[in-house]
Amino acid sequence: MATHQLTPPITEAQVRELRVDDTVTLQGTLFGIRDATQIAIFDRGRATRFDLAGHAVIHTAPNVRKVAASAEFPTGYAPVCIGTTTSSRMERFTRPLLAQCGVRLIIGKGGLGPGSLAAFSELGGAYLAIIGGTAALETTWVEAIEDVDLDDLHPESLWRFRVCGFGPLRVAMDSHGGSIYAAVDAGARGKRAAALAALGVKAG
């Protein structure tokens, strides 16, 4: 298990160094994205002025407060609570995020499916997991909301955060076919089969 300090944008070679159970801490730029954002971009053809190539995105729709624009709050938004949402709803967007936008890292909770794992392997990407219920802690890692695009979708806008020490995050899916979710599922199925056999129950 290795630890990595990364400052996006990162290269394919860097993301392929990551292995399941490694930890990653991010510095610099992090983009916030959610269901409506990706529907707008990939289903409805809306463009963004942000270059996501080599970057990390986090599945979030942050709670923010409108304030006067200043050096501290350049967009006129102050972060209140920036937490992570469940990723599984956005499974179908993993491949286009990597293939069309050049995203390298996806941060979320709960994991993604086999289609995403295949995309990570083919295109060079990884999924970094956050434990649910840590939004207050995550918010302390965000120094500022630097910019926002597609803001008519608020709060599911496309956010550009400046982060410091964002992590450690666990590499839960890597570009080599590794997935803690697949491993847990296989282990649970094995234990279920053993328990049923011990009870004399035939598994269906």
Identify the meaning behind each predicted range.
Residues 1-10:
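Short, structured beta-strand/loop micro-motifs enriched in basic residues and often containing a Trp
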Residues 23, 29-33, 175:
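Short, charged beta-turn/beta-strand-edge "cap" motif at the junction between a beta-strand
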Residues 32-167:
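Feature captures the catalytic cores and cofactor-binding loops of soluble hydro-lyases/lyases
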Residues 12-17:
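Short, surface-exposed secondary-structure edge patches
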Residues 140-204:
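C-terminal binding/interaction regions
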